[in-house]
Amino acid sequence: MQNIGFAAGSLIKGRWTVVKKIGQGAFGEIFSGKNIINNEQIAIKVEKVDTKKQVLRLEVAVLKKLQLCPYVCRFITCGRHNDYNYMVMELLGENLSELRRKQLDGKFSLGSTLKLGVQMIQSLQAVHDLGYLHRDVKPSNFAIGLNPSKRNITYLIDFGLARRFVLASGEVRPARESTGFRGTARYASINSHLSKDLGRRDDLWSIFYVLIEFAEGQLPWRKLKDKDQIGEMKQKYNTPDLVKDLPPQFSQFMKHLKSLNYEDRPNYVFLQTLLNDCYTSLGLSESTPFDWEVQTNSGASSSSSNTTQQQQQQQQQQQQRNLNQSGLNNSSARLMASPSTIDVEASGKSTQLNNSNNNNNNNNKGLGAENDSSPQPQIIRRNSESNSQIANSSESDNKGSGGGSWNQKSSSPRHKDKNLQDDGGEGSQKHLKASNNNNINNNNNNYNNNNNNNNNSHMNGNGSNSQPIDKIELSHQQQKSSTTKCCSTSKCSVM
């Protein structure tokens, strides 16, 4: 695409200043920036208003609904500036693709791979429970926090290819006979290569491929460029041999995914428990750092640093080999994936999501998994997913392109949503406390009940407002009144 041309030093709405371009995609560009009022570092995503395929509106809609999930980046504001639509969000650190390439042999230790897997599954479950598919799951669409206290948190980003997979009634949309390819060839599911309509299982197939690459440093089709050839090789390796050098939990993970049909809801708890059991069987604990968190003396040489990391990886690899030889017993021990506190900031303010890990009666003892000492995969096959379990709002058909202009003259209900208007950066984040005292199922029920009573306020709007997107501010009372939860994890409960 052509360079959008946001110059360094440009000022947006008298508050956000552009620093430099940090990324570019098919439909827009991303810049780092700064809030000139409080010096907060931000990211600004922009697209031209006359872009044929506008995706920013959809991304804003999804991101705003996920703001209570600890594994989704913080949304700040959105609007129009001159001939551009823009979205301001929290600036994050390196993505997982960059971090992996910095590791020895280009791979993560097994322990880090498993911890990452649990966080990624939890973030995808939150998206799915809102009724959306991500459809472009890959390492570069997960990034760690920029703040040192958040470098152990993985955030899901880039919802430009997201698609709503449920109807207003809560039923899963009928599968289309044929669709175009969606995603990134290396990590896309076989169904995507076959031009089949994608479901929740396909996002998890992408997670599966990502985890293999994290643990082994490569995928068998890494050298191929043609997506059709990649698809053929994926079908060839669609057997347990693909994970023969990994712990047996990976083959169980694969077996569950292969059992799912288009409309089925994956057993997220079962998948998290598999990874959690493998993690605890390695003798690792909650305090075990990610590979990139390993501390080295500032004066130590590069070779000394490499030796330390190499010893750590060799130790974990030896543990892995021992486990492969002897097999693993299911463990009831669980490890909490999130840190004890997670900062959530909004417009220069901050609060704490208190995730207490010391409650002996807490049913969520795993990396987000339920306390089930002998988990069995459960598959729900039905076209109706119950209105209380999937998203709440009535949606027009979304083809994955984000469709439509931010101009309020559009006839699509989605384009008249008052919640997508520019709020000037104030009050876009709800200050709520997360409780860790409810198990995952209770959280699902509470979240869904809230959704059903929310009158579809997040996405539908009343369609009566014809003002431009950057002229309408959300009142504090409007924002304060919404307590819809974004996901079913214990960390996202609303007190």
Swiss-Prot record:
Domain of life: Eukaryota
Comp. bias regions, Low complexity: 295-333, 354-364, 435-466
Disulfide bonds: none
A single MF term (Gene Ontology): protein serine/threonine kinase activity
Annotated ranges, domain Protein kinase: 16-275
Positions with biased composition (Polar residues): 385-395
Stored PANTHER family: CASEIN KINASE-RELATED (PTHR11909)
Protein name: Probable serine/threonine-protein kinase DDB_G0292354
